[in-house]
C-alpha cells in the first residue's frame, strides 16, 4: 500500500490528517530509530490512543536496528548466531539442552559430535530408510525465517516416500537430492520437538516457541522483553514473517511469564485477540509453563556469549522443560515492538546503552567520524577488542 493510500485510510479511521502523519514520519526518519514510512504504519504509530511523541521515538526501524547490531554485536562473534551448528556445538559443550541431532548433511564432511555426516544423496537415502528416528525436523545450518525447513512424520517403506506433517509426500531420493547447502554450512536432521501439552492445546500442532531478549548489563544478564510466537494453521514454524505467515505474537510479562496480550498481523490489518482463532483456547492470560526455568537457562547461557551485548534467545517449552533453539543478534526488534505496542528504546534500554558508553551512536544521526578509526565500525566491542 502506498503512503498516500495508507495516510488516507488512517485519516478516515482516526481523523489524523495526512500532513500531520507526514510530519510524524519525517521526524521519526531523522530520529534515533530511523523509521521509514512503512514502519510508521506497521507499528501503528499514528494511533493517538496509544502513542505520543515520546513513545513514538522509542521505536526502532530496520535502519536503526542495523546500527544497533553494528554497535552492540562483535563482528567476529556473529558466526555463533548465523550458523546453527556452531551454536549447537557450543551450547552442547556447555551442558545446555538443545534438540537431539540425528545427522548432518555436508558434502565436505563437516562433523558434529558423534553423529553421522552424510556427504551425498545416496548416503542421505540410506539414512532416511534405515537410520533416522521418525518423526524428524530438518533445517539448513545457515538461514532463518523458516526457509528450507521440513517436518517429516514418517516413511512409507513400501512406496519409498516420506510423509510430511502438512500432508504432502515426497520420494526419498527426490527429497535427498533437493536438500539445500546454504553458504556451504550444511543441513541438520534433528528431533522434532514436542511442545508442552498446555501450549499445544492452545497453539495447535506447530512448534510455538518464545523469544527472550537479554541485555548484557555491567551487573550481569537481564531479561528485557519476551514474546510468545503462536503458530496457526498448517505452519510448522512459529515465524511471524512481518505478519504474512498468519502466526500470532503474544506479549509476555517477563517477571511472571503471563501472556498479557496477543496480536495478529501488522499495521492497518492488525487485530487483537484473546483466543486462538482455530483451537478456540484462551491465549491472553495464559501462563507459559516452566517460565522461571526458561528465564534462568537463558540468563546462564547468555554469559557464554560476551560478543553479543543484546541477545535474542529462541526457546521451546517441552513437556520436560525449556530447550534452546538458537541465539540471535538483537533478536528482531519488530517482534517485541509489535507484540508490546512499545518501542525497544525505552528508559531501561537507554540506561543500558549509556552504561555501555555507546549512547552517542544511537542518539540521532550517526556520522562517519563517530566510527572507530581502527575498525571502521560504530561498535564498542570492536573498539574494546582490537583484534
Residue ranges and their predicted role:
Residues 177-205, 214-217, 223-225, 229-318:
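A long amphipathic alpha-helix within ATP-dependent nucleotide-binding catalytic cores
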Residues 2-133, 142-144, 298:
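Conserved N-proximal alpha/beta basic substrate-recognition cap immediately N-terminal to
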Residues 83, 139, 314, 326:
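Acidic active-site catalytic centers that drive phospho-/nucleotidyl reactions
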Residues 136, 222, 323-325:
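Protein kinase-like catalytic core scaffold
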Residues 13, 152-164, 238-254, 361-380:
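A short, terminal or domain-edge coil/loop segment
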Residues 84-210, 387:
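Active-site nucleotide/adenylate-binding loops and adjacent lid/helix of ATP-dependent enzymes
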Residues 107-108, 142-144, 194-195, 219, ...:
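Short, solvent-exposed loop/turn segments at secondary-structure junctions
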